[in-house]
Swiss-Prot record:
The keyword Ribonucleoprotein applies. SUPFAM superfamilies: Nucleic acid-binding proteins, Translation proteins SH3-like domain. Keywords: Chloroplast, Plastid, Ribonucleoprotein, Ribosomal protein. Part of the 50S ribosomal subunit. The gene is rpl2-A. Residues 1-20, 224-254 are annotated as: Disordered. Belongs to the universal ribosomal protein uL2 family. This is Large ribosomal subunit protein uL2cz/uL2cy. It is found in: Plastid, Chloroplast. The keyword Thylakoid does not apply. GO terms for molecular function: rRNA binding; structural constituent of ribosome; transferase activity. GO terms for biological process: mitochondrial translation. GO terms for cellular component: chloroplast; mitochondrial large ribosomal subunit. Disulfide bonds: none annotated. It comes from Nuphar advena.
Length: 273
Protein backbone atom coordinates (compact mmCIF):
# COMPACT_ATOMS: atom_id res chain seq x y z
CA UNK A 1 0.00 0.00 0.00
CA UNK A 2 1.32 3.44 -0.99
CA UNK A 3 0.87 6.05 1.76
CA UNK A 4 0.54 9.61 0.51
CA UNK A 5 1.57 12.32 2.98
CA UNK A 6 -0.05 15.70 2.44
CA UNK A 7 1.98 18.88 2.41
CA UNK A 8 1.27 21.06 5.44
CA UNK A 9 -0.58 23.74 3.49
CA UNK A 10 -3.61 23.85 5.80
CA UNK A 11 -4.28 22.64 9.35
CA UNK A 12 -6.61 19.92 8.07
CA UNK A 13 -3.92 18.37 5.88
CA UNK A 14 -1.05 18.76 8.33
CA UNK A 15 -1.35 15.21 9.71
CA UNK A 16 -3.08 13.52 6.80
CA UNK A 17 -1.73 10.21 5.47
CA UNK A 18 -3.98 8.39 3.01
CA UNK A 19 -3.76 5.61 0.47
CA UNK A 20 -3.55 7.08 -3.03
CA UNK A 21 -2.91 3.96 -5.09
CA UNK A 22 -6.05 1.79 -5.19
CA UNK A 23 -9.20 3.19 -6.81
CA UNK A 24 -12.73 1.84 -7.09
CA UNK A 25 -14.55 1.09 -10.35
CA UNK A 26 -16.91 -1.77 -9.44
CA UNK A 27 -18.84 -3.98 -11.85
CA UNK A 28 -22.52 -3.10 -11.88
CA UNK A 29 -23.70 -6.73 -11.61
CA UNK A 30 -21.65 -7.30 -8.43
CA UNK A 31 -22.94 -4.32 -6.44
CA UNK A 32 -26.26 -3.30 -4.95
CA UNK A 33 -27.60 -0.49 -2.82
CA UNK A 34 -27.90 -1.05 0.89
CA UNK A 35 -30.23 0.94 3.13
CA UNK A 36 -28.33 1.83 6.29
CA UNK A 37 -31.29 1.94 8.64
CA UNK A 38 -31.11 3.13 12.22
CA UNK A 39 -27.50 4.32 12.35
CA UNK A 40 -27.09 3.24 15.94
CA UNK A 41 -30.80 3.32 16.85
CA UNK A 42 -33.18 0.50 17.63
CA UNK A 43 -36.74 0.08 16.33
CA UNK A 44 -37.98 2.75 18.76
CA UNK A 45 -35.36 5.28 17.65
CA UNK A 46 -33.37 5.06 20.89
CA UNK A 47 -29.56 5.16 20.63
CA UNK A 48 -28.15 1.70 21.35
CA UNK A 49 -24.74 2.15 19.68
CA UNK A 50 -23.16 5.51 20.37
CA UNK A 51 -21.06 7.62 17.99
CA UNK A 52 -22.74 6.40 14.79
CA UNK A 53 -24.56 8.43 12.19
CA UNK A 54 -24.20 10.26 8.91
CA UNK A 55 -21.54 9.08 6.51
CA UNK A 56 -21.34 8.86 2.76
CA UNK A 57 -23.67 6.59 0.81
CA UNK A 58 -22.15 3.23 -0.08
CA UNK A 59 -22.75 0.49 -2.61
CA UNK A 60 -22.23 -3.00 -1.24
CA UNK A 61 -19.84 -5.26 -3.17
CA UNK A 62 -20.80 -8.93 -3.31
CA UNK A 63 -17.76 -10.75 -1.92
CA UNK A 64 -17.28 -14.47 -2.55
CA UNK A 65 -16.43 -15.78 0.91
CA UNK A 66 -17.44 -19.36 0.03
CA UNK A 67 -14.99 -19.84 -2.87
CA UNK A 68 -17.16 -22.63 -4.29
CA UNK A 69 -15.84 -22.43 -7.86
CA UNK A 70 -14.11 -25.78 -7.43
CA UNK A 71 -11.14 -26.74 -9.61
CA UNK A 72 -11.71 -23.80 -11.98
CA UNK A 73 -8.77 -21.43 -12.24
CA UNK A 74 -9.35 -17.70 -12.17
CA UNK A 75 -7.26 -14.67 -13.04
CA UNK A 76 -6.98 -11.45 -11.02
CA UNK A 77 -8.16 -8.62 -13.26
CA UNK A 78 -8.40 -5.62 -10.92
CA UNK A 79 -7.55 -4.64 -7.34
CA UNK A 80 -10.14 -2.24 -5.95
CA UNK A 81 -11.04 -0.21 -2.88
CA UNK A 82 -14.10 -1.33 -0.90
CA UNK A 83 -15.78 1.29 1.33
CA UNK A 84 -17.41 -1.45 3.44
CA UNK A 85 -14.16 -2.93 4.80
CA UNK A 86 -10.55 -1.93 5.40
CA UNK A 87 -9.18 -4.71 3.17
CA UNK A 88 -8.93 -4.41 -0.59
CA UNK A 89 -10.87 -6.66 -2.95
CA UNK A 90 -9.90 -8.07 -6.32
CA UNK A 91 -12.05 -9.05 -9.29
CA UNK A 92 -11.57 -12.62 -10.50
CA UNK A 93 -12.39 -13.86 -14.02
CA UNK A 94 -12.87 -17.65 -13.92
CA UNK A 95 -12.40 -19.98 -16.84
CA UNK A 96 -16.13 -20.72 -17.12
CA UNK A 97 -16.98 -17.03 -17.52
CA UNK A 98 -17.94 -16.40 -13.89
CA UNK A 99 -16.80 -13.09 -12.36
CA UNK A 100 -16.53 -12.64 -8.60
CA UNK A 101 -14.93 -10.45 -5.96
CA UNK A 102 -12.67 -11.95 -3.29
CA UNK A 103 -10.52 -10.48 -0.53
CA UNK A 104 -7.18 -9.34 -1.87
CA UNK A 105 -4.35 -11.60 -0.59
CA UNK A 106 -1.14 -9.84 0.36
CA UNK A 107 1.34 -9.86 -2.50
CA UNK A 108 -1.17 -10.78 -5.21
CA UNK A 109 -0.91 -8.69 -8.37
CA UNK A 110 -2.98 -8.31 -11.51
CA UNK A 111 -2.55 -11.34 -13.75
CA UNK A 112 -2.00 -13.90 -10.99
CA UNK A 113 -3.97 -17.15 -11.14
CA UNK A 114 -5.90 -18.65 -8.22
CA UNK A 115 -7.96 -21.80 -7.81
CA UNK A 116 -10.06 -23.47 -5.12
CA UNK A 117 -10.64 -27.17 -4.53
CA UNK A 118 -9.47 -30.19 -2.58
CA UNK A 119 -6.17 -30.95 -4.30
CA UNK A 120 -4.77 -27.57 -5.29
CA UNK A 121 -1.27 -26.15 -4.72
CA UNK A 122 -0.49 -24.48 -1.39
CA UNK A 123 0.04 -21.05 -2.88
CA UNK A 124 -1.17 -17.56 -2.12
CA UNK A 125 -4.85 -16.98 -2.82
CA UNK A 126 -5.82 -20.63 -3.29
CA UNK A 127 -8.70 -21.97 -1.17
CA UNK A 128 -8.82 -25.55 0.09
CA UNK A 129 -9.94 -27.55 3.15
CA UNK A 130 -7.82 -27.45 6.29
CA UNK A 131 -7.26 -31.21 6.09
CA UNK A 132 -5.24 -30.74 2.89
CA UNK A 133 -2.96 -28.03 4.32
CA UNK A 134 0.40 -28.71 6.00
CA UNK A 135 1.04 -27.52 9.54
CA UNK A 136 2.31 -23.98 9.84
CA UNK A 137 0.35 -22.66 6.86
CA UNK A 138 -0.66 -19.00 7.06
CA UNK A 139 -4.35 -18.66 6.18
CA UNK A 140 -7.25 -16.22 6.18
CA UNK A 141 -10.99 -16.18 5.35
CA UNK A 142 -11.61 -19.27 7.50
CA UNK A 143 -14.93 -21.06 7.71
CA UNK A 144 -16.48 -21.87 11.08
CA UNK A 145 -19.42 -23.83 9.66
CA UNK A 146 -18.86 -26.02 6.61
CA UNK A 147 -20.28 -24.39 3.48
CA UNK A 148 -21.25 -21.12 5.15
CA UNK A 149 -18.25 -19.18 3.89
CA UNK A 150 -15.27 -17.59 5.58
CA UNK A 151 -15.96 -15.74 8.82
CA UNK A 152 -12.57 -15.52 10.58
CA UNK A 153 -9.45 -13.47 9.71
CA UNK A 154 -11.01 -11.22 7.08
CA UNK A 155 -9.75 -7.77 8.15
CA UNK A 156 -6.84 -5.98 6.50
CA UNK A 157 -3.54 -7.64 7.43
CA UNK A 158 -5.24 -10.51 9.27
CA UNK A 159 -3.57 -13.92 9.22
CA UNK A 160 -4.11 -17.12 11.20
CA UNK A 161 -1.85 -20.15 11.52
CA UNK A 162 -2.63 -23.85 11.35
CA UNK A 163 -0.76 -25.36 14.30
CA UNK A 164 -2.22 -28.87 14.76
CA UNK A 165 -4.57 -31.47 13.31
CA UNK A 166 -6.07 -34.25 15.40
CA UNK A 167 -9.13 -36.38 14.77
CA UNK A 168 -11.88 -34.40 13.08
CA UNK A 169 -10.58 -31.01 14.23
CA UNK A 170 -7.80 -28.61 13.34
CA UNK A 171 -6.23 -26.18 15.80
CA UNK A 172 -5.75 -22.58 14.68
CA UNK A 173 -4.04 -19.58 16.22
CA UNK A 174 -6.17 -16.58 15.30
CA UNK A 175 -4.95 -12.97 14.88
CA UNK A 176 -6.31 -12.09 18.34
CA UNK A 177 -4.09 -14.75 19.95
CA UNK A 178 -7.02 -17.08 20.57
CA UNK A 179 -6.39 -20.78 19.95
CA UNK A 180 -9.50 -22.67 18.92
CA UNK A 181 -10.69 -25.83 17.19
CA UNK A 182 -12.24 -25.85 13.71
CA UNK A 183 -13.53 -28.77 11.69
CA UNK A 184 -10.87 -30.08 9.31
CA UNK A 185 -13.43 -30.09 6.50
CA UNK A 186 -13.84 -26.31 6.66
CA UNK A 187 -11.98 -24.38 3.99
CA UNK A 188 -9.65 -21.39 4.19
CA UNK A 189 -7.58 -19.26 1.85
CA UNK A 190 -3.79 -19.47 1.85
CA UNK A 191 -1.89 -16.32 2.70
CA UNK A 192 -2.49 -13.05 4.51
CA UNK A 193 -5.10 -10.41 3.80
CA UNK A 194 -3.65 -7.44 1.95
CA UNK A 195 -3.46 -3.76 2.91
CA UNK A 196 -1.30 -4.51 5.95
CA UNK A 197 -0.35 -0.85 6.32
CA UNK A 198 -3.87 0.30 7.08
CA UNK A 199 -2.83 1.27 10.62
CA UNK A 200 -0.39 3.81 9.16
CA UNK A 201 -3.20 5.88 7.67
CA UNK A 202 -4.19 9.11 9.37
CA UNK A 203 -7.41 10.86 8.43
CA UNK A 204 -5.98 14.21 9.49
CA UNK A 205 -9.26 15.98 10.18
CA UNK A 206 -12.63 15.44 11.79
CA UNK A 207 -14.55 15.74 8.53
CA UNK A 208 -12.91 12.61 7.14
CA UNK A 209 -14.12 10.71 10.19
CA UNK A 210 -17.66 11.94 9.58
CA UNK A 211 -17.55 10.59 6.02
CA UNK A 212 -17.05 7.12 7.53
CA UNK A 213 -20.24 7.43 9.58
CA UNK A 214 -18.47 7.97 12.91
CA UNK A 215 -19.66 10.84 15.09
CA UNK A 216 -17.61 12.73 17.70
CA UNK A 217 -16.77 11.11 21.04
CA UNK A 218 -17.25 13.33 24.10
CA UNK A 219 -15.28 12.63 27.29
CA UNK A 220 -17.35 11.76 30.31
CA UNK A 221 -15.36 14.08 32.59
CA UNK A 222 -16.71 17.15 30.75
CA UNK A 223 -20.35 16.03 31.05
CA UNK A 224 -22.85 16.71 33.81
CA UNK A 225 -23.41 14.15 36.58
CA UNK A 226 -26.79 13.26 35.08
CA UNK A 227 -25.09 12.21 31.83
CA UNK A 228 -22.01 10.32 33.02
CA UNK A 229 -20.52 9.01 36.31
CA UNK A 230 -17.33 10.99 35.58
CA UNK A 231 -19.23 14.27 35.19
CA UNK A 232 -19.66 17.18 37.54
CA UNK A 233 -17.32 18.97 39.90
CA UNK A 234 -16.06 22.52 40.13
CA UNK A 235 -13.88 23.46 37.20
CA UNK A 236 -11.51 20.83 35.88
CA UNK A 237 -12.09 17.97 38.32
CA UNK A 238 -10.99 14.30 38.34
CA UNK A 239 -13.46 11.50 37.75
CA UNK A 240 -14.02 11.02 41.49
CA UNK A 241 -13.76 7.23 41.36
CA UNK A 242 -11.08 4.61 41.84
CA UNK A 243 -11.48 3.27 38.30
CA UNK A 244 -13.01 4.60 35.07
CA UNK A 245 -16.55 3.48 34.30
CA UNK A 246 -18.89 3.42 31.34
CA UNK A 247 -21.86 5.83 31.12
CA UNK A 248 -23.92 3.08 32.78
CA UNK A 249 -21.58 2.57 35.74
CA UNK A 250 -19.81 -0.63 34.67
CA UNK A 251 -15.99 -0.93 34.78
CA UNK A 252 -14.62 0.58 31.58
CA UNK A 253 -11.17 -1.01 31.31
CA UNK A 254 -10.43 -4.72 31.34
CA UNK A 255 -13.91 -5.98 32.13
CA UNK A 256 -14.72 -9.20 30.30
CA UNK A 257 -17.88 -8.88 28.27
CA UNK A 258 -18.11 -12.39 26.82
CA UNK A 259 -21.19 -14.36 27.84
CA UNK A 260 -20.54 -17.05 30.43
CA UNK A 261 -21.11 -20.67 29.43
CA UNK A 262 -21.36 -19.80 25.76
CA UNK A 263 -21.83 -22.77 23.45
CA UNK A 264 -18.52 -22.18 21.66
CA UNK A 265 -16.42 -22.30 24.86
CA UNK A 266 -15.71 -25.99 24.26
CA UNK A 267 -13.89 -25.11 21.01
CA UNK A 268 -11.65 -22.43 22.54
CA UNK A 269 -8.43 -23.85 23.94
CA UNK A 270 -6.92 -20.50 24.92
CA UNK A 271 -8.69 -17.18 25.16
CA UNK A 272 -7.56 -14.17 23.21
CA UNK A 273 -5.00 -11.82 24.68
Amino acid sequence: MAIHLYKTSTPSTRKGAVDSQVKSNPRTNLIYGQHRCGKGRNARGIITARHRGGGHKRLYRKIDFRRNEKDISGRIVTIEYDPNRNAYICLIHYGDGEKRYILHPRGAIIGDTIVSGTEVPISMGNALPLTDMPLGTAIHNIEITLGKGGQLARAAGAVAKLIAKEGKSATLRLPSGEVRLISKNCSATVGQVGNVGVNQKSLGRAGSKCWLGKRPVVRGVVMNPVDHPHGGGEGRAPIGRKKPTTPWGYPALGRRSRKRNKYSDIFILRRRK
